[in-house]
Amino acid sequence: MKVLVLLLVTLAVVYAAPDPRGILINLEDGEICMNSAQCKSSCCQHFSPLGVARCTRKASENSECSPKTLYGIYYKCPCERGLTCESDRTIIGAITNTNYGICLDAGRSKE
């Protein structure tokens, strides 16, 4: 019973005044991450298979992109809001995280 009370008090103290920056979530660009859900930008990217993943801003128009990831970490970030990642999507590419494309403005590309 004492352990439960101590645990509840500890949790109350931890959540009483959360840091807006965050330690595990709400990470800024450049901070080390393990999953895109931790980043404010929603993109956790690593530049090599052995490299450390860091939060990075999403891809801008005409930049390389990944449409989706199964693992939460990207080699190429998805597009900014309002853009679409035009790519050849394959099952193998989805598994190996190599379905790369280019960010295009959906409104302009249909004209």
Curated annotation (Swiss-Prot):
Q: Which GO terms describe its cellular component?
A: extracellular region
Q: Which cysteines are joined by disulfide bonds?
A: 33-44, 39-55, 43-77, 65-85, 79-103
- Record keywords: Digestion, Disulfide bond, Lipid degradation, Lipid metabolism, Secreted, Signal
Tissue-specificity statement: Expressed by the pancreas.
- Keyword check for Lipid metabolism: yes
Which GO biological process annotations does it have?
digestion; lipid catabolic process; response to bacterium; response to food; retinoid metabolic process
Q: How does it associate, per the subunit comment?
A: Forms a 1:1 stoichiometric complex with pancreatic lipase.
Q: What is this protein called?
A: Colipase
Protein source organism:
Ictidomys tridecemlineatus (Thirteen-lined ground squirrel)
Q: Output the lineage of the source organism.
A: Eukaryota, Metazoa, Chordata, Craniata, Vertebrata
